[in-house]
């Protein structure tokens, strides 16, 4: 992953009521996405059955309002990891004996990283410690350094930004200073 400063434990879960409640998502009761017990008066009881990452089942929890996005996620690279398999097959070439080693490396590293909608648009990825970006506010365009390059920084991030010696950055970044999303 990339270099992202870890958040303090309280920063990972604090909901900024002023910011969050002013958003469309802030108008939805917590239990609509996260479950739990709305009538409970104690924290432990209120959090029984809590779903920490509802976007792991995006069709169920996000699809009612975000039908188009959740439908396209089924074929998205962060879900299918198709780009990795293209690379693995290219690197292995016509040498099937290379596949087991590459597949093992993929299973031990890359296959554990990829993520849900919320883990890019609401919080930092788990591999850099997780935690909400800005008090549970959903970011339509996530902050590149706290989301995209947090995972892809040591490999793809530097390549995208043109930080690898002798290799120019991605044309979208070089020419248009476009973020990766």
Which ranges hold each PLM region?
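Short sequence/structural segments immediately N-terminal
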Residues: 1-181
């Amino acid at each position: 992953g990339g270099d992202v400063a870890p958040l303090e434990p309280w920063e990972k879960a604090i909901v900024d009521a002023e910011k969050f409640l002013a958003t469309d998502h802030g108008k939805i009761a917590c239990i609509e996405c996260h479950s739990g017990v709305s009538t409970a008066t104690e924290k432990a009881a209120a959090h029984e059955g809590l779903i920490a990452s509802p976007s792991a089942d995006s069709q169920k929890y996000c699809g009612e309002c975000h039908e188009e996005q959740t439908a396209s996620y089924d074929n998205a690279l962060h879900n299918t990891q198709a780009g990795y398999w293209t690379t693995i097959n290219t690197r292995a070439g016509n040498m099937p004996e290379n596949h087991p080693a590459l597949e093992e490396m993929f299973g031990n590293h890359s296959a554990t990283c990829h993520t849900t909608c919320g883990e890019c648009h609401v919080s930092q990825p788990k591999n850099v410690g997780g935690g909400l970006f800005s008090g549970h506010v959903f970011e339509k365009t996530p902050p590149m350094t706290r989301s995209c390059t947090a995972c892809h920084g040591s490999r793809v991030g530097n390549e995208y930004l043109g930080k690898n010696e002798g290799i120019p950055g991605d044309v979208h970044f070089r020419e248009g200073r476009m973020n990766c999303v």
